[in-house]
């Protein structure tokens, strides 16, 4: 649920509230509705990127209220309105409480919380606090699934006049002979690298988050003798890269054996075993690992040899999309067995 807390300040000015927010790491931000950006409504945003603390951040607006409302609430001309979205993290809600509490100490006044009432702060016990690892995995998994959903939505409505003409040619022998000029088949083949990018991102970034945030994975990394190039050391010192990302790059996350090796070593998760299960995908029982390997091989042949699979239809490509989705689902289920709370929105 989104939470809005308004502080009807007793003694504040526009300049004072702006300086206050800036001093507390709020940055000026424009509202996405242009009409809301006026001299009487100055928007700010707080967002903490480190350790996935924020998911949506805290919105704050310095507002000049009407004379009628000023008398109604017995407050200053300028008030402070804050909002956290429904999907906001525990830390976002916590920051919202803190900024209103600090502002009230400085400017006085009465606060109204649209969920908890007058002079009531948000009860943080109503919100689950996730670890950095849990939030990181949730963000990575949901981001991966969202991209797969987007490509499915695009293809569901995709039509090509030439492809439809070729599909209706008779006899079948003639249609088979002309399949090489079907533009849709080239399109579906060219989208295979997209699926591999999702696979690489999902497994690679989850691995990097484990060795950054998971205690036993970090301990193992600390005991590891890893050779690091001087250029990588400089990148770390400049905060242009991290040790976790450099270690991640030492594995090939477009290769299932390499993925399995990395996960087994640092997380004790056997990816091959996890994905070897037989599951129903698009109405058929498949071994997910086998189909995932076929996707990786198809991408390799297309990229390096321009090998076109002329049997790859829209339906078959969408089965591949579902296969990657199932691989993500099975991996998250395995991670949850270790006691991690992962929120999947799809």
Protein language model regions, located:
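Short, intrinsically disordered low-complexity segments
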Residues: 24-88
């Amino acid at each position: 649920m989104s939470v809005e807390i308004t502080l009807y300040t007793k003694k504040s000015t526009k300049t004072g509230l702006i300086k206050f927010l800036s001093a507390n790491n709020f940055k000026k931000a424009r509202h996405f509705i242009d009409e809301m950006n006026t001299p009487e409504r100055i928007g700010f945003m707080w967002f903490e990127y480190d350790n996935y603390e924020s998911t949506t951040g805290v919105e704050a607006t310095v507002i000049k209220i009407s004379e009628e409302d000023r008398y109604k609430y017995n407050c200053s001309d300028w008030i402070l309105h804050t909002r956290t979205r429904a999907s906001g993290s525990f830390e976002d809600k916590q920051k919202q409480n803190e900024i209103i509490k600090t502002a009230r100490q400085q400017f006085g006044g009465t606060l109204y919380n649209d969920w908890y009432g007058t002079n009531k702060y948000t009860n943080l016990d109503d919100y689950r606090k996730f670890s950095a690892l849990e939030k990181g995995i949730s963000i990575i998994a949901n981001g991966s699934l969202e991209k797969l959903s987007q490509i499915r939505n695009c293809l569901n409505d995709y039509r090509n006049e030439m492809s439809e003409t070729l599909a209706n040619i008779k006899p079948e022998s003639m249609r088979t002979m002309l399949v090489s000029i079907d533009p849709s088949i080239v399109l579906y083949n060219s989208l295979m690298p997209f699926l591999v990018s999702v696979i690489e991102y999902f497994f690679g970034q989850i691995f990097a988050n484990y060795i950054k945030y998971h205690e036993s994975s970090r301990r193992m990394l600390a005991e590891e003798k890893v050779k690091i190039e001087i250029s990588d050391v400089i990148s770390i010192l400049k905060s242009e890269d991290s040790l976790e990302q450099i270690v991640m790059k030492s594995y090939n996350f477009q290769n299932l054996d390499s993925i399995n090796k990395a996960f087994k070593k640092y997380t004790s998760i056997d990816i091959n075993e996890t994905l070897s299960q037989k599951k129903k995908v698009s109405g058929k029982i498949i071994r997910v690992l086998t189909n995932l390997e076929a996707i990786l091989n198809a991408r390799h042949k297309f990229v390096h040899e321009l090998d076109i699979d002329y049997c790859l239809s829209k339906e078959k490509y969408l089965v591949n999309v579902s296969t990657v989705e199932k691989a993500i689902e099975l991996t998250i289920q395995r991670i949850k067995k270790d006691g991690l709370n992962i929120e999947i929105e799809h």
